[in-house]
Amino acid sequence: MILKPENEKKLIIDVLKKFGVPEEDAKITADVFVDADLKGFTSHGIGRFPQYITALKLGNINPKPDIKIVKESPATAVIDGDLGLGQVVGKKAMELAIKKAKNVGVGVVATRNANHFGIAGYYSELAMNQDMIGITITNTEPAMAPFGGKEKILGTNPIAIAFKGNKYKFSLDMATASIARGKILEALRKKIKIPEGCAVDKDGKPTTDPAKALEGCILPFGGPKGYGLALAIEMLSAIGGAEVGTKVKGTANPEERCTKGDLFIAINPEFFMGKEEFKRKVDELLDEIKNSEPAEGFEILIPGEIEERNKMKRKDGFEIDKNLYNQLKEICNELGLNIEDYIE
C-alpha cells in the first residue's frame, strides 16, 4: 500500500477539519507530518497520526486554541498554546523567534500547554531558511532512566540544530536517548524487535522487545554524556513554565493532557561575523569534512544529508504497513471519508 506525500497531506487536512481544526492550522500540521515521512522519520510521520486523533476525541488537543504571548521582551517570549496542536504552536513560536532575531540578533521563545509537535528539525530549518541558526529542544514524558538507574524520569528529549552555507546545509535532529520512543512504538505496531543496547525491561535487564522496553526504560545515548544532555534539555525546555521529570505527560499517551515544554531559538549571524562570512565558513568547514579521507567501508556524511536523500527517494510515495492502514481506515470510516481516496 503506497501513500504519496500529496495524499498524506490531503488525508491529514481532511481528517483534522472534521474535528474542527481550521484549514490553515490543518495545513501547517500536515506539512510537519509530511516532512517527517519524506525525511524517513517514520516514527513521527503518518504512523503517529492516530495518537493525535485519540487526543482530539478526548479533548486533550484543543482544535481551536487561543494561543497567547504571556510574557515578552525584545529578544524573548513565552507562549501559552492553550492545548493546541504542537505543530501550530511550534511554527508560531519559531517564527516569532526569527522576527526577534532579525531585530536584535537573537530570539528565544518558550512554549507551554502545547501538544506533541512532530519532528524538531522542521522548526530549526524554518530559521535556517532565513539564513539564521535554528535550535529547537523539547522534553517528553518519562521514558529514560538517569545513567546508572532503572527508573523512568527523563524524556527522550530531542534537540535539533540547523544552519546553512551557500553550498551545504547542516540539519541535526536527534533524541538524547539511544532510540526515540516513537521508533519503539513503531516497532510494536509492526511487531518487530528494536536494536540491542537501546533499552532495558522493568527489571533493568537488556531487551529487544518493544513492549518490554516501553514497560522498562530507554537508555541514554553515550551513557553519562547523553544523560547529561537530556537532563539539561529537560530543564531548558520547561523555562516557559512547563513541567519537568515525572510530571511531564501526554507526549506519548494521548489519554493524558500534554504538560511538556519547548524552546525555540533563532540566532542571526549578521549580528556576529556577518551573514555572508558565516555562510562562507560553513562551506569551508563542511568542504573540509566531505573531502576528508573516509575509513574503509564508510562514507562521510553531514547531518541532514541522509534525510535529503530520503526526500528524493520517497517523493513519489512510500509504503505503509497493514496495521497502520487499518488504523487510518477506521478513522476515515468514523468520519465518513474513504481511505481509498488517499492510499493506493
Swiss-Prot record:
The principal localisation class reads: cytoplasm
Biological process (GO) annotations held by this record are: coenzyme M biosynthetic process
Q: List GO terms (cellular component aspect).
A: cytoplasm
Which UniProt keywords are given for this protein, alphabetically ordered? Coenzyme M biosynthesis, Cytoplasm, NAD, Oxidoreductase
Q: In which pathway does it act?
A: Cofactor biosynthesis; coenzyme M biosynthesis; sulfoacetaldehyde from phosphoenolpyruvate and sulfite: step 3/4; Cofactor biosynthesis; 5,6,7,8-tetrahydromethanopterin biosynthesis
Q: Which InterPro entries match?
A: LDH2/MDH2_Oxidoreductase, Mal/L-sulf/L-lact_DH-like_ah, Mal/L-sulf/L-lact_DH-like_NADP, Mal/L-sulfo/L-lacto_DH-like_sf, Malate/L-lactate_DH-like
The record lists the catalysed reaction(s) as:
a (2S)-2-hydroxycarboxylate + NAD(+) = a 2-oxocarboxylate + NADH + H(+)
Q: Where in or outside the cell is it found?
A: Cytoplasm
Instruction: Indicate yes or no for the key word Repressor.
Output: no
EC code(s) of this entry: 1.1.1.337
Top-level division of the source organism's lineage: Archaea
An example Gene Ontology molecular-function term: L-2-hydroxycarboxylate dehydrogenase (NAD+) activity
Keyword Iron set for record? no
Q: Which SUPFAM superfamilies match?
A: L-sulfolactate dehydrogenase-like
What family classification does the UniProt entry report for this protein?
Belongs to the LDH2/MDH2 oxidoreductase family.
What does this gene product do? Catalyzes the reduction of sulfopyruvate to (R)-sulfolactate much more efficiently than the reverse reaction. Also catalyzes the reduction of oxaloacetate, alpha-ketoglutarate, and to a much lower extent, KHTCA, but not pyruvate. Involved in the biosynthesis of both coenzyme M (with (R)-sulfolactate) and methanopterin (with alpha-ketoglutarate).
Q: What is this protein's name?
A: L-sulfolactate dehydrogenase
Natural source organism? Methanocaldococcus jannaschii (strain ATCC 43067 / DSM 2661 / JAL-1 / JCM 10045 / NBRC 100440) (Methanococcus jannaschii)
From the broadest rank down, the organism's phylogenetic lineage runs: Archaea, Methanobacteriati, Methanobacteriota, Methanomada group, Methanococci
